[in-house]
Amino acid sequence: MDGLVAPAPIPHGPPVRGTLFYKMTGSGNDFVVLDGRATTPERWAAARVRAICDRRTGVGADGLVILTPAAAGTVRMSYWNSDGSHGAMCGNAALCSGRLAVELEMVPAGEFCLLTDAGMVRVLSQGPADDAEINLPDVDLPRDGPELEPASGEHWISLGAVGVPHLVVRVDDIETVDVPSRGKALRSDPALGPAGSNVNFVSPQSDMRAPWLIRTFERGVEAETLACGTGTVAAGLALAARREAGLPVTFRSRGGPELTVRAQVGASRAHDVWLRGQGRRLFRGVWEDQEDGR
């Protein structure tokens, strides 16, 4: 990416009591992000993650991220869902992490790596337009969902994994889908095993040149979220595998800003997989709880 402009470093104020956090969003998928130089993943048990992610009594978020500098040009991204469960990977969290790691001067602007539990993710840091691009590990193309029968208005169901498992459901009209109900039923379908899966519903618009529409029921949040990065990648690969869309393909979620997927698709695997989308810092604050000695 030529012409990148590094965001200005965030000024450091006086010492604070508690944990300094950054609230970020990727297409409406929101996160609390912490600097791992000031805290450690070991201090964030499930109950504490749930507390800070609670939308009524905490900061409110779909997930928690801790960024920790590792080897040169590498940042460790630890991720938890809002229910306190650990997540191997989150695409929108990676986009947000790519921006904040540069702002916190963990790495210089340009290209660097995020180390996740789903593998190494290359990041192209964004300019001032609040966007970033991530290069994901090669993945198998989504396949027909095992023993999952499409309901009325559904064309097909595919199952894939982009760091975490994803169902992709092609529907006639995404606005008529009861995402909380249908998503919850598919997420815990016995055919998927005890871990279940995220569920993504996709439909085209009347203008086939317009972005595809996508809505997601997220495992670990156990609700519909405004966007899902890895789910968007799974959807793009499923559509490409069925030749319903060419790559790159762009999606619009309920969160607003678009996400674009590009990849090289072979007979059974996708290579050079990229996701481009928003990574925006909303505000920062201080979280005080019993762990901080309040």
Outline where the language-model segments fall:
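A glycine-rich beta-to-alpha transition motif near the start of alpha/beta enzyme domains, typified by
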Residues: D2-P128, V168-R294
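Short glycine-rich anion-binding loops that position phosphate/pyrophosphate groups of nucleotides
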Residues: S27, V139, P165
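Active-site glycine-rich loop that binds ribose-phosphate moieties when present
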Residues: D138-I157, K184
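Internal active-site segments that recognize and position negatively charged phosphoryl groups
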Residues: E149-D178
